[in-house]
Structures are given as C-alpha cells and as structure tokens.
C-alpha cells in the first residue's frame, strides 16, 4: 500500500476530539466506521486474497489493526469464517469502486463484498492518540512521554503548560500501561529538598505506594522510592562501569545508593566496600545484599563519603592482613556420587583497592581532594615494588551540553582544583590522562559525564593532612 493510501485510511481512524477535557470520558472515544469487507468463502483463501487485495490497496490499513476479523454474518462467524476489512473507498453496492481483482474474485464466488460496521473503542487508541485528542493543538509538540519507570511507579516531570491536564495524562498512562499502578509528578529538583537526592512529589494516579521492586543486571532491589535515589535510565552506565571490575578485586563504591554497581559486581565475585550516607539507602543496600546472596563479597557502610574515602584504603589493607576472605561453597555433588564433597573455595581480600566509584554527579568532584595521602607510607604495595597499579577513580559529574571540547576542559579544571594535578582528556590507563565518557542528557543544556583516571602517584602518596 502506498503512503497516500495509508494516510487516507489512518485519517479516518483519528481519535475523536475531546479538547480541553479535565476528566477522562472513555465513551467519547468509541466510534463506528461504516466500511466494507470481503467475506471469504473458505478460510484457506484468506492469505491469498489478503496479499492480492493489499497489492490493489483495498485492504484497510491502520497501525495496531488486523484487517482479518470474524465474518459479520453471525451464522458464518459461528462456523469460524473470516472476512477481510476493506478500505473506505470500497462500496458494497457499487462494483465500480472495486478493482478488477476484487470483481473477478466475486464472480468466482470465492468472496462477497458485504457491509461491515467496524466498532472502535477506547481500548484501540494508544496513549498519544488519546492525549492528542484532549490537549489543545498548540501543546502537541512536547506531549509528556519520557518518564522513569521504577517498578510499578511512573515518574513524570510535567512542564508548566501541561499541568492543567496532569491528572488526565496520568489516567491515560495507567490505562495504556497495565504494569504501571502509580503515576507521580516531581515537584522539585532532585536533591533540592535534601542531600540524599530524594524529591518531593505528588501522586497523579493510582495509590500512593512507593514500595517497589526492580530487576537490573540479574539482581533484585526492593526499596521505598520516596526515600532513596534510583534512576532506571542509568542501567547501561551501571553495566559499563561494572564491566571494568575483575573477580577478586576490591572496589570502593563511595556513593553506593542501594547498590546498582555494588550488588551486580558482587555477583561476579568482586569485593565491594559499598558506602552511602543515607540511612535508608544503607538499609535497602543490606536487603539487596541478602536478597541477592552476595554477602561474601559486598560489605555495606553508612559513612560520610569524605570520611569513607580517607579510611577505605586502610580498612581494606587491615582486612587483607587479617586474612579476610570470601568462602564460596561448591555445587553439591549428585546424591549417588561416591566422591567426597569438594572443599569450599576461599577467595582472599587483596591488600589494595582497584577502583573507586563516585556516582554523585552534582558534587562528586568536590570529594576528590580526600584521595591525597590515600596510600601514604604504603608505596611498597604498588609498582615498581609489585605489579599492582594505583586505583582508577570513576567520578560522575555534570557539565554543559556543547559540541566543542568546552565540557572536557571544564571537567579537567575542576579535577585539577581538587587534586592539584592537571589531567588531559585521553586514556584512563595512561599517566596524566583522563577518559571522559559522555553518559547521557539530563536537561536541554546539561549532560552527565563520567571521568575515569588512574590516581596520580603524587596524590596517592602525598602526606596526609
């Protein structure tokens, strides 16, 4: 079917206008289209005539619509007979509106062109169809569509011009997304109410139930979304960062939240010292550790991030000297096996940290000065005395959205201000360089980045303040 024919049919199926409605009346969206159908004499001919009539552009085309339906004659429909709904230009009583293909098939008795009343209900229309029919035309350009889905909660950020329609927008979202039970609207910026990146919200639809369960990277997280930070749009970034970690290494997650980096890393045998200052995040992190059975590898902390950075290296070194290890129980042998059960595998905690993760983009760079003197007096743990390298720091941050290298320079200067070493954009593995990864848009003029660099020796081994 050519594009003009498709547009012609689709225009007939536009949702009825319900301009400026403030409450949802689903009955408004019911309509009946007086159409025609090809009543097929035998169902085995359905595929043949669908293909032929599509070539002649006589089959009704509409997104989400299957033109093969039960025959309009109840007695034939009860026998399982089907029909093909035809385009509106086909008139049952006017053979001159039929193509030669349709006329010939009718003469052969393989089909009959009959009237067909096509009933369309509210369920047929998608979210955009319904909302467009309600909003004034001048608001069609930026219909609220992008939202975070956290478990059963849809989190909107509705702009001012759409606020008069917020409740009806929420109701349509609930209707068209069965997995969503609650719709909320953010009424302040994340973190503006407190330091834990939570936000004030209003419930637009459904119950005020923020206890959610989400699955990410094969892990289950349960939490109260109103009390902790979670962003489902960061799942790709979580996977990217954890892909750098190797089993048996130690990672210090400074602003761990409820564990989107820590718990998946623990699943792959990485030791994670996971910290968050928010007591609620710490509580749900502990739950995630138990739920996902990663307690051998993930250790939760509830400290201020500044203090955690300064003490983390010493804590890991002490754990290594104590002989701390993860004990991995091997799979049980078959019941009838005569072989003795295998011994548990012990994975020792290494003496040094391989990676630091700092996912607090609004202010994480301001924590970097705490790395000065991190390994003061322990130079012998690293190259050239051993094969161990200093840790890589992954620090998330915001910067301007620009096409040139201005954001990169800005990030390098801010890092320099904190650690006293000027890095240049490049490779995280190379001395004096920093890999600046563009994570995602967060606002029209703002983007989120992740700066990854190996901690410079002059910082790590500096005298402690």
UniProtKB/Swiss-Prot annotation:
GO terms, biological process: mitochondrial tRNA methylation; tRNA N1-guanine methylation
InterPro entries: MeTrfase_TRM5/TYW2, SAM-dependent_MTases_sf, TRM5-TYW2-like_MTfase, TRM5/TYW2-like_N, tRNA_Gua_MeTrfase_euk
Residues engaged in binding S-adenosyl-L-methionine: 238, 304-305, 359
Subunit note: Monomer.
Subcellular location: Mitochondrion matrix; Nucleus; Cytoplasm
GO molecular function, one term: tRNA (guanine(37)-N1)-methyltransferase activity
Top-rank lineage group of the source organism: Eukaryota
Signal peptide: none
Protein name (database record): tRNA (guanine(37)-N(1))-methyltransferase
The entry's keywords: Cytoplasm, Methyltransferase, Mitochondrion, Nucleus, S-adenosyl-L-methionine, Transferase, Transit peptide, tRNA processing
Organelle transit peptide: 1-20
Presence of keyword Transit peptide: yes
Family that this chain belongs to: Belongs to the class I-like SAM-binding methyltransferase superfamily. TRM5/TYW2 family.
EC number: 2.1.1.228
Region span, Disordered: 326-345
GO cellular component annotations of the record: mitochondrial matrix; nucleus
Task of the protein: Specifically methylates the N1 position of guanosine-37 in various cytoplasmic and mitochondrial tRNAs. Methylation is not dependent on the nature of the nucleoside 5' of the target nucleoside. This is the first step in the biosynthesis of wybutosine (yW), a modified base adjacent to the anticodon of tRNAs and required for accurate decoding.
Reactions the enzyme catalyzes: guanosine(37) in tRNA + S-adenosyl-L-methionine = N(1)-methylguanosine(37) in tRNA + S-adenosyl-L-homocysteine + H(+)
HAMAP family to which the protein is assigned, alphabetical: TRM5 (MF_03152)
């Amino acid at each position: 079917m050519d594009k003009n024919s498709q547009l012609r049919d689709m225009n007939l199926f536009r949702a009825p206008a319900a301009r400026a409605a403030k409450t949802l009346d689903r009955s408004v969206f019911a309509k009946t289209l007086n159409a025609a159908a090809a009543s097929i004499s035998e169902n085995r001919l359905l595929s043949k005539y669908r293909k032929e009539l599509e070539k002649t552009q006589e089959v009704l085309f509409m997104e989400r619509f299957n033109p093969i339906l039960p025959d309009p004659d109840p007695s034939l429909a009860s026998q399982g007979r089907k029909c093909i709904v035809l385009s509106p230009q086909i008139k049952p009583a006017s053979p001159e509106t039929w193509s030669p293909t349709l006329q010939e098939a009718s003469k052969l008795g393989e089909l009959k062109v009959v009237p067909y009343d096509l009933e369309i209900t509210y369920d047929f229309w998608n979210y955009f169809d319904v909302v467009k029919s309600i909003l004034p035309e001048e608001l069609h350009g930026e219909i609220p569509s992008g939202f975070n889905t956290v478990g059963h909660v849809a989190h909107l950020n509705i702009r001012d011009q759409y606020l008069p329609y917020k409740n009806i927008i929420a109701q349509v979202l609930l209707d068209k997304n069965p997995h969503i039970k609650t719709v909320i609207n953010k009424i302040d910026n994340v973190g503006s109410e407190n330091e834990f990146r939570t936000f004030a919200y209003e419930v637009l639809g459904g119950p005020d139930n923020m206890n959610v369960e989400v699955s990410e990277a094969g892990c289950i997280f349960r939490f109260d979304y109103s009390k902790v930070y979670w962003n489902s749009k960061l799942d790709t970034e979580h996977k990217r960062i954890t892909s750098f970690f190797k089993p048996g290494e130690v990672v210090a997650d400074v602003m761990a939240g409820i564990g989107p980096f820590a718990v998946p890393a623990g699943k792959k045998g990485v030791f994670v010292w996971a910290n968050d200052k928010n007591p609620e995040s710490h509580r749900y992190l502990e739950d995630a550790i138990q739920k996902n059975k990663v307690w051998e590898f993930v250790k939760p902390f509830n400290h201020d991030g500044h203090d955690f950075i300064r003490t983390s290296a010493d804590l890991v070194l002490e754990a290594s000297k104590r002989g701390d290890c993860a004990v991995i129980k091997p799979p049980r042998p078959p019941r009838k096996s005569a072989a003795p059960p295998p011994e548990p595998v012990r994975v020792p905690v290494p003496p040094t940290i391989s990676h630091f993760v700092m996912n607090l983009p609004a202010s994480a760079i301001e924590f970097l000065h705490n790395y000065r003197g991190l390994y003061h007096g322990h130079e012998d743990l690293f190259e050239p005395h051993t094969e161990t390298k200093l840790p890589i720091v992954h620090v998330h941050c915001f910067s301007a959205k620009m096409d040139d290298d201005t954001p990169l320079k800005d990030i390098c200067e801010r890092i320099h201000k904190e650690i006293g070493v000027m890095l240049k954009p490049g490779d995280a593995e190379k001395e004096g360089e920093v890999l600046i990864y563009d994570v995602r848009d967060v606002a029209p003029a703002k983007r989120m980045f992740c700066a990854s660099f190996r901690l410079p020796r002059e910082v790590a081994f500096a005298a402690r303040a």
